Amino acid sequence: MSPSEYALEVAKRRTFAIISHPDAGKTTITEKVLLFGHAIQTAGTVKGRGSSHHAKSDWMEMEKQRGISITTSVMQFPYGGCLVNLLDTPGHEDFSEDTYRTLTAVDCCLMVIDAAKGVEDRTRKLMEVTRLRDTPILTFMNKLDREIRDPMEVLDEVERELNIACSPITWPIGCGKSFKGVYHLHKDETYLYQSGKGHTIQEVRIVKGLNNPDLDVAVGEDLAKQFRQELELVQGASHEFDHEAFLSGDLTPVFFGTALGNFGVDHMLDGLVEWAPAPMPRKTDTRVVVASEEKFTGFVFKIQANMDPKHRDRVAFMRVVSGRFEKGMKLRQVRTKKDVVISDALTFMAGDRSHVEEAYAGDIIGLHNHGTIQIGDTFTQGEDMKFTGIPNFAPELFRRIRLRDPLKQKQLLKGLVQLSEEGAVQVFRPLSNNDLIVGAVGVLQFEVVSSRLKSEYNVEAVYESVNVSTARWVECHDVKKFEEFKRKNELNLALDGGDNLSYIAPTMVNLNITQERYPDVIFRKTREH
């Protein structure tokens, strides 16, 4: 393959994830995006728990029962001359660190906001994570077919709470029962909405020009007049789109529509392929790797168990950073310094696996893993380096875990360590006793862990509450001061699954006082894998 052909393949790639608060419509928008990418023929209504139409991106038994997407799957589809990789992230109240880590593997994010509710808690948290890498953000204001808040007010809230400038690309005409469509500010065109056509791609009627009398006929004179006045205000008060500011994560283009009604999603996709960056350079501990390099490099950002209920395999998800992956290729696993031949890598359309013949920078491939791959592992064609920026996040919820059958302590520890390497949960072993404490970012992680311990390790475990409210990884450059810190705080110290020392605090107040008392000790919220 010539360098110019390779450069073309890389330039076509767009890799993004969707971030939203639960029930803002993320799974629905995922389906509609796949519909436009012709990856599925009709959109099954999501959450139809009793029906056989489960959303394409929700799998694993627990998900099917609850109508939520726990596992982060990957879907690739063509759109507008590009190849788009969509990484699905759990959006339910109970999500996990996987969600955070997935955001480190994409070049761009789509933020979905319920226009009736505005900025919600989970959206804030996820936006904080995208800030770690200044990821570019597109915004989709959803549920315009319902009664919503004043769009200007919602934009102000996004700017104020998420500290990002908003640049409206489309603007709604009416909402709820009187939702008539959107006007595209860049194209000077109005797209008219028809309700009840959400399952397929609609033939949309377009009215060219803002002052076209056809617009008055289509939406009614009063609404048209009101809309033109509103638009004047919007254009005066909002930011012009600036591509550089978008790429640096300082400005977000905003699109309006309804994912359920399948309206406005294509405008967002057009913006994505036009403006979102092709695969970006990434830092390693020795240098920066650029996507156009010939040699293959990639890193593992997530490990998922039992994607195939018939086999107890685990799949490691790897983001290709540079070069081209080919079937049967020999790669160096940098952490273990071993060379491995990858003959059966996978690509994904949720739930349907197919074997990869080749993959390029920006693509996500799945590697079969029998316990030898860990999160954060770097694979190269021989070069010794490690990609940085794939973090562990300090858990926010803690439980003590206890066995029904005390003789299975060994299996429990083995299971927990493996699950922590996968990123399903974090394990802490206090230095002062034999407790096992598990830490998570979302409640559902605890359920997932106990059901997997039972099915994969044949261990029945029960949870008990524990007096821990937060944890931090600790380190100190002054050995003497660190020894004193360890001696005086032994009751609050624990080792995590990778034997890293951590401070487990009963309250935030306790943590703050301890930090003030030991200014030389560094307390970290995230830890590199």
Swiss-Prot record:
GO cellular component, one term: cytosol
Start and end residues of each tr-type G domain: 11-280
GO molecular function: GTP binding; GTPase activity; guanosine tetraphosphate binding; translation release factor activity, codon nonspecific; translation release factor activity, codon specific
GO biological process per UniProt: regulation of translational termination; translational termination
Function field: Increases the formation of ribosomal termination complexes and stimulates activities of RF-1 and RF-2. It binds guanine nucleotides and has strong preference for UGA stop codons. It may interact directly with the ribosome. The stimulation of RF-1 and RF-2 is significantly reduced by GTP and GDP, but not by GMP.
Family indicated by similarity: Belongs to the TRAFAC class translation factor GTPase superfamily. Classic translation factor GTPase family. PrfC subfamily.
Protein name: Peptide chain release factor 3
Source organism (scientific name): Yersinia pestis
